[in-house]
Regions:
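Histidine-centered divalent metal-coordination motifs
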Residues: 74
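Aromatic-glycine hotspot motif
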Residues: 1-69, 78-160
């Protein structure tokens, strides 16, 4: 998957650089996003709750010290914040869908401030079914935003 992913990513980067292939680039992006979501959905099907919270490398440096539930939360919080706060300027899915309560998350951030046992304590509180509902809604809303973007939008800056 890594080689295929890398090739698709190169194709995406090439296509979005030109106005006449920009929409094809978005199609490649959607394919990559679907591949990622299918992998995450296979985790939901194949793993048990303990697997989502397991931290076998808690004392390692970098991303190896995290767990699956945290990684899913972290990635989709970043996407939600960027898509809605920075690009569209509207309410994040976390808030509009009342997901903080539904997921039972004590934080609204990406979780960067959490380390070691804090990550483990955090993810043990999460409702995994609702986390998966959240990521599906974030994916859907982000893709609606992406579909609306034009090549000329790439030249726009982020408003203050």
């Amino acid at each position: 998957m890594n080689k295929e992913w890398s090739e698709q990513n190169k194709k995406l980067q090439m296509l979005i650089k030109k106005a006449d292939t920009f929409d094809q680039g978005k199609d490649v992006l959607f394919e990559l996003r679907n591949d990622l979501m299918n992998t995450l959905l296979s985790f939901r099907k194949d793993l048990n709750r303990e697997d989502f919270d397991s931290m076998p490398f808690m004392n390692a440096d970098g991303y190896h010290s995290k767990n699956i539930a945290y990684s899913i939360w972290h990635i989709f919080r970043i996407e939600d914040i960027v898509a809605h706060t920075l690009i569209k300027g509207d309410d994040e899915v976390l808030f509009s869908g009342n997901y903080q309560r539904r997921i039972n998350s004590p934080v609204i951030t990406t979780g960067n401030e959490l380390v070691k046992e804090q990550i483990s304590d955090f993810t043990k509180q999460l409702n995994i079914d609702e986390l998966y509902s959240y990521i599906a809604d974030v994916k859907k809303s982000t893709e609606e935003i992406i579909r609306s973007l034009t090549y000329s939008d790439l030249k726009l800056g982020i408003p203050d």
